[in-house]
């Protein structure tokens, strides 16, 4: 009798296991497609300054990536080595149309994306690690400021 109940429970659970695996594969394929097509938005949820504690971001901060433009609207917390020429502009708020975009796969199935703006003096480069489940982390290296990291997720651009 015990074996019959175990068999019934196993038959009920098996379709759910298969669906979960298919859903994971579909999400990975979708993330791969938007990364390779350069058509996505990185939504920052946590800022991790070099010095100090992490900060949860409550506003809609992000980095929009398309084939011809990168638009950054990210906050900065940290130390600046030189004073900005225009203090009303944020250090990570810029739009660039001239940039290098390099993508490579990493060992765990995700992607490493390096964006190097060429028509903006600061930041120097943005290095993003995108995981196959859609979560991502980004490090912003700057000439005149301490590096800062962000954790968040990647989604298709609307």
Identify the function of each model-found stretch.
Residues 64-110:
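Mature extracytoplasmic domains of secretory-pathway proteins
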Residues 23-84:
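N-terminal secretory signal peptides
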Residues 10, 46, 76, 117, ...:
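A broadly conserved detector of short glycine/acidic/proline-rich loop/turn motifs that flank catalytic sites
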Residues 94-158:
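Helix-rich interaction surfaces within compact, conserved domain-sized segments
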Residues 1-26:
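Bacterial Sec-dependent N-terminal signal peptides
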Residues 22-23, 48-57, 85-95, 114-121:
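Short, solvent-exposed secondary-structure boundary motifs
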């Amino acid at each position: 009798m015990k074996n019959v109940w175990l068999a019934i429970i196993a038959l009920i659970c098996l379709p759910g296991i298969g669906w979960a695996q298919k859903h994971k594969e579909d999400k990975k394929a979708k993330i791969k497609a938007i990364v390779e097509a350069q058509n996505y938005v990185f939504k920052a949820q946590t800022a991790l300054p070099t010095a100090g504690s992490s900060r949860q971001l409550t506003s809609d901060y992000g980095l929009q990536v398309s084939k011809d433009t990168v638009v950054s609207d990210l906050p900065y917390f940290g130390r600046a080595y030189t004073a900005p020429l225009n203090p009303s502009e944020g250090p990570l708020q810029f739009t660039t149309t001239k940039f290098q975009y390099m993508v490579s796969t990493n060992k765990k199935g995700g992607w490493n994306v390096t964006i190097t703006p060429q028509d903006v003096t600061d930041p120097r480069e943005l290095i993003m690690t995108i995981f196959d489940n859609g979560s991502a982390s980004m490090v912003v290296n700057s000439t005149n400021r301490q590096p800062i990291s962000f954790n968040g997720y990647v989604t298709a651009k609307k």
